[in-house]
């Protein structure tokens, strides 16, 4: 078995002369936790002992100073496997892979990660199997940068090591990773935004029909739009906080007083009047559990096939919610290059047309 090591080399230029190693690494977006972990790294490769931090081939401390022309070598070493993702033999549809990134096309019906009732047969387990049994690398820790629901298909991004996992997670939290979805939903979502003038507009009657939304009783009764809806040009924005339904494990709901911030942008709507459904493209600003499903249900346009949130199956072709992670944009953790990927719809969603 090969050791799971990620080594990065930095040639120090004049602009970084005089900085400590720690200060330099902070400029490269290394966190304190990452730097602290490097101090514990020690391994043997080709008969030579190496360390997590080396300057000009010698063990170095993070407080040591750098000079122009120095070669700083950083090594991340996986110490132990993630026990919750047991290796599982399952074909992987790899869209892109390099030293830091694994981008997969997830099929519907496969869990992204272990959870109650789905401890085996997960994509995380399949990735562990791929690296251990096929690539001969051990241990492997599956670092999913985002997740997809069991019956959602499409692009899923993984960081292959501590370095890429940390930087991609930073980007995810900062909103620098753009994920777009293609979906089919009942009705025409654009109708919910007619006459929308502000994201606080609300109809108490609509609110009652949509469940307990946590909307204050003091709001005017004359307004006729659900809260959290805003139209800017062609973009339809849903800003409606989401929380877990009390005494429910899976079910989520919109709740304006107690929910967590959740924002979904509908970028385009193609309505098919003869079929009474729409094909829509969406972009997430946040990543709450079931966010798209909850938000579309909230505006009265649940996903086709999403029985959990009110969407009955439309045709025999759809045995799941009609939701597909179709494109992703992010910056490569090592060189900052902008990465863009887009994949077509799976067959079951194509057959809806």
Describe each PLM feature range:
Residues 1-353:
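RNA pseudouridine synthases
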């Amino acid at each position: 078995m090969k050791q799971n090591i990620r080594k990065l080399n930095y040639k120090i230029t004049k602009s970084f002369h005089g900085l400590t190693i720690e200060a330099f690494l902070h400029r490269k977006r290394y966190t304190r936790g990452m730097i602290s972990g490097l101090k514990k790294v020690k391994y043997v490769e080709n008969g030579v002992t190496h360390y997590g931090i080396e300057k000009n081939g010698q063990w170095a401390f993070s407080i040591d100073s750098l000079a122009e022309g120095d070669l700083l070598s950083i090594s991340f070493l996986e110490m132990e496997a993630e026990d919750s993702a047991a290796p599982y033999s399952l074909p992987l549809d790899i869209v892109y892979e390099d030293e830091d990134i694994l981008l997969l096309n997830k099929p519907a019906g496969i869990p992204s990660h272990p959870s109650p009732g789905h401890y085996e047969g997960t994509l995380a387990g399949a990735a562990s199997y791929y690296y251990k049994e096929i690539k001969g690398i051990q241990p492997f820790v599956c670092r999913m940068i985002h997740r997809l629901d069991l019956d959602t298909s499409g692009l899923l991004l993984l960081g292959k090591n501590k370095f890429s996992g940390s930087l991609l997670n930073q980007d995810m939290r900062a909103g620098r990773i753009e994920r777009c979805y293609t979906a089919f939903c009942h009705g025409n979502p654009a109708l919910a935004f007619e006459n929308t003038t502000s994201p606080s507009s609300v109809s108490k009657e609509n609110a009652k029909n949509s469940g307990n939304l946590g909307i204050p009783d003091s709001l005017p009764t004359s307004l006729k739009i659900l809260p959290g809806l805003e139209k800017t040009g062609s973009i339809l924005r849903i800003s409606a906080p989401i929380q877990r339904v009390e005494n429910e494990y899976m079910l989520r709901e919109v709740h304006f007083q107690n929910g967590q911030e959740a924002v979904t942008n509908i970028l385009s709507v193609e309505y098919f009047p003869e079929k009474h459904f729409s094909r829509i493209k969406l972009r997430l600003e946040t990543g709450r559990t079931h966010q798209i499903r909850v938000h579309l249900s909230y505006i009265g346009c649940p996903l086709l096939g999403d029985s959990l949130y009110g969407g009955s199956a439309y045709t025999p072709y759809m045995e799941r919610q009609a939701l597909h992670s179709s494109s992703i944009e992010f910056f490569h953790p090592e060189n900052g290059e902008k990465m863009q990927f887009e994949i077509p719809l799976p067959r079951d969603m194509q057959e809806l047309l």
